[in-house]
Amino acid sequence: MLTLYTQKTVTDDDHSLIMTDEECERIKILEHERSLAFDKYYRFGRTAEPSLVLDDFLFLGNLQHASNRVLLERFKIKHILNVCDLGLEQNIMNNFNVIHIPMPDEPQTNIKKHFDRTNELLHGIYEKKECCLVHCAAGISRSATIVLAYLMKYHHNTLKEAFFFLIEKRPQIWPNEGFLLQLLRYETELIRSREITANDNESTEAIQMQENPIETLNEFEHKHEKDE
C-alpha cells in the first residue's frame, strides 16, 4: 500500500537559512562529531543492513535496504517511510505500508514542515509495536533528519543529545547544514513548549511532568540494558 504526499517541499517565504552566530557555532560542534564518526565508519567497515536505532521498532537505512524484500521481512519491517525523490518498486508497495514524502536533499528544502506528520506516524507505529524503516537514497541526510526530529519530540532530547545518540547507531549520518539549522530551530520550538529542556545537563523533572509517554533516550537505554 502506498501513501504519497505530493505537497511541494521547498523553502517558503517564512523560512530563512541565514544563521545566527550561535547557530553557526552549534552546527560546527555537530559537524565535528559527525566527521569523527564518519572517519570510524570508513576505517572499520560498513554494513549491508539498515541501522537499528531503537530496539524492535525503528530502523534507518537507504534505498537499497527499502528495495530488498527478503531483508525487510527478516527484520519484520511492516512500514516504510520513504523521504527520497525515487519511489519503490510495485512489489514492495504491494507487500508493505509505504509512505512516500518526496523531497530533494538540498539545504533550502523545508523539511521541518513535515516533522509533525512524520513524528505522529512513527509514534503510531511504536504504539502498535510494529517495525518501521525510515530511508532516503543513502540513509544519511533526509532520513537521518526525520529520525532526529522524532528522537527530539518523543524522547525529550536536545538536538545535541539526539545527534550523539544517533551517530552511535549509524555513524555515517550527514544531514546537510540547512537541515541541521532547521533541527536547531525545531529544538527551540520544543523548548518553548517545555517538551525538552534547554540545558543538556538539566534535570528531567520538568519533562517527566509532561504527557509524553516515551522515556528519554538515557532512560530507554538503561531500561533495555536491565532487561537483557
Explain the meaning of each model-derived region.
Residues 99-132:
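Helix-loop module immediately N-terminal to the HCX5R catalytic loop
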